């Protein structure tokens, strides 16, 4: 599906452009070596030397990490030293490749300018200084890419928790509760745009407890019938939703089930607590990823996707006015328009039959002599 239908500010998943640029650099470097007329065997030897140096440097860095992880074998690796070694050193093929290449250069002839012991000492010095000076850390973009790829973001956990612990429980029975509500309240939620749960996603994570304070044109009307579910040892845990009336120019313009996405309160509280180490920029990034992840989850669950609509918005910071009630009305009317389009009957008007479309008929005259084609001669 396209990323993202919710809001232009929500980022798309990262692609593979970095690998494409690396491929361009690879082709450019090969062209430079070809123009310089460097002997291929000389290029391959030094290329293998650099690869061996890189692998050896990674091994030294990982051994330093292993020294720390061995102190946490019981708590982090269930007492398995092998798991700790694998977590730090990774695939042993890299280590074997480094050893083979190092041995190759040690026994290589005609390389008087290359001393393995000198290279090893210089490499250890470089890696030690790099770790002490903090030169080995990833850039913020690399950290963000790794967290998104491995699903390690705070937003990923919040989105799944919100879906499994709340939306998956209430959305399947939402239509039955709406029908019960309509029987008691004169079909208040009978409109095509009123039969869904509208969830508000302010990207600044400002989630007040009273919607009428945010916008006086959003007025509380009533509560849907409660849903009781036995959950995590809690008998008859109550889930409830609120029905709001939306005003436009002082007149009722729509009725819907409306609420904020409560995990946004968690993100806001984390950004206010210094112990969480969560900056305002982190909060904005995680709020966007939370919306995108929840959209991806709902996209694969039709019974949940068809019962709710996400309203993602970002209030302008340049002083321009923003009306939450108008934003909600826009989504309600869009929902009604989509509902009418989906339910419109597929009718087609058949063209009137023409003479050429009729079956051919054989006309036989009862006269003895044939008549001419020109009627003016009769």
UniProtKB/Swiss-Prot annotation:
3',3'-c-di-GMP binds at residues 165, 237-240, 262. The keyword Phosphoprotein applies. Changing residue 308 to S: Does not affect palmitoylation. Changing residue 205 to S: Does not affect palmitoylation. GO terms for biological process: activation of innate immune response; antiviral innate immune response; autophagosome assembly; cellular response to exogenous dsRNA; cellular response to interferon-beta; cGAS/STING signaling pathway; defense response to virus; innate immune response. The keyword Transmembrane helix applies. It catalyses: H(+)(in) = H(+)(out). Residues 35-44, 107-115 are lumenal. One of its GO terms (molecular function) is protein homodimerization activity. It is found in: Endoplasmic reticulum membrane; Cytoplasm, Perinuclear region; Endoplasmic reticulum-Golgi intermediate compartment membrane; Golgi apparatus membrane. Phosphorylation by TBK1 leads to activation and production of IFN-beta. Following cyclic nucleotide (c-di-GMP or cGAMP)-binding, activation and translocation from the endoplasmic reticulum, STING1 is phosphorylated by TBK1 at Ser-365 in the pLxIS motif. The phosphorylated pLxIS motif constitutes an IRF3-binding motif, leading to recruitment of the transcription factor IRF3 to induce type-I interferons and other cytokines. The phosphorylated pLxIS motif facilitates SENP2 recruitment during late phase of viral infection. Phosphorylated on tyrosine residues upon MHC-II aggregation. Coiled coil: none annotated. Changing residue 147 to S: Does not affect palmitoylation. Keywords: Autophagy, Cell membrane, Cytoplasm, Cytoplasmic vesicle, Endoplasmic reticulum, Golgi apparatus, Immunity, Innate immunity, Ion channel, Ion transport, Isopeptide bond, Lipoprotein, Lysosome, Membrane, Mitochondrion, Mitochondrion outer membrane, Nucleotide-binding, Palmitate, Phosphoprotein, Transmembrane, Transmembrane helix, Transport, Ubl conjugation. Facilitator of innate immune signaling that acts as a sensor of cytosolic DNA from bacteria and viruses and promotes the production of type I interferon (IFN-alpha and IFN-beta). Innate immune response is triggered in response to non-CpG double-stranded DNA from viruses and bacteria delivered to the cytoplasm. Acts by binding cyclic dinucleotides: recognizes and binds cyclic di-GMP (c-di-GMP), a second messenger produced by bacteria, cyclic UMP-AMP (2',3'-cUAMP), and cyclic GMP-AMP (cGAMP), a messenger produced by CGAS in response to DNA virus in the cytosol. Belongs to the STING family. This is Stimulator of interferon genes protein.
């Amino acid at each position: 599906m396209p990323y993202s239908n919710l809001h232009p500010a929500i980022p798309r998943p990262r692609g593979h452009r970095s690998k494409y640029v690396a491929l361009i650099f690879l082709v450019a470097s090969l062209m430079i070596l070809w123009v310089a007329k460097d002997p291929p065997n000389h290029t391959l030897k030094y290329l293998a030397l650099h690869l061996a140096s890189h692998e050896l440097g990674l091994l030294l860095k990982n051994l330093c990490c292993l020294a720390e992880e061995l102190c946490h074998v019981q708590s982090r690796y269930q007492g398995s030293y092998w798991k700790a070694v694998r977590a730090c050193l990774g695939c042993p093929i890299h280590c074997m490749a480094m050893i083979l290449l190092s041995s190759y250069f040690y026994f290589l002839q005609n390389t008087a300018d290359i001393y393995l012991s000198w290279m090893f000492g210089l490499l250890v010095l470089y890696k030690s200084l790099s770790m002490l000076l903090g030169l080995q850390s990833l850039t913020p973009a690399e950290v963000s890419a790794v967290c998104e790829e491995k699903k390690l973001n705070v937003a990923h956990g919040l989105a799944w928790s919100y879906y499994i612990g709340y939306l998956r429980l209430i959305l399947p029975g939402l239509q039955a509760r709406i029908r019960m509500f309509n029987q008691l309240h004169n079909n208040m939620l009978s409109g095509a745009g009123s039969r869904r749960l509208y969830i508000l996603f302010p990207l600044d994570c400002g989630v007040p407890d009273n919607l009428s304070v945010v916008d006086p044109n959003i007025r509380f009307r009533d509560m849907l019938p409660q849903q009781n579910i036995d959950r995590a040892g809690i008998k008859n845990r109550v889930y409830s939703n609120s029905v709001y009336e939306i005003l436009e120019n002082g007149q009722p313009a729509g009725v819907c089930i409306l609420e904020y996405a409560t995990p946004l309160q968690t993100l806001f509280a984390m950004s206010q607590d210094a112990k969480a180490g969560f900056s305002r920029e982190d909060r904005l990034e995680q709020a966007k990823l939370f919306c995108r992840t929840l959209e991806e989850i709902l996209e694969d669950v039709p019974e949940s996707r068809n019962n709710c609509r996400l309203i993602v918005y970002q209030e302008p910071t340049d002083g321009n006015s923003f009306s939450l009630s108008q934003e909600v009305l826009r989504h309600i009317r869009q929902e009604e328009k989509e509902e009418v389009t989906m339910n419109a009957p597929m009718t087609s008007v058949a063209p009137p039959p023409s003479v050429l479309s009729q079956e051919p008929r054989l006309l036989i005259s009862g006269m003895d002599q044939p008549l001419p084609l020109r009627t003016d001669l009769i």
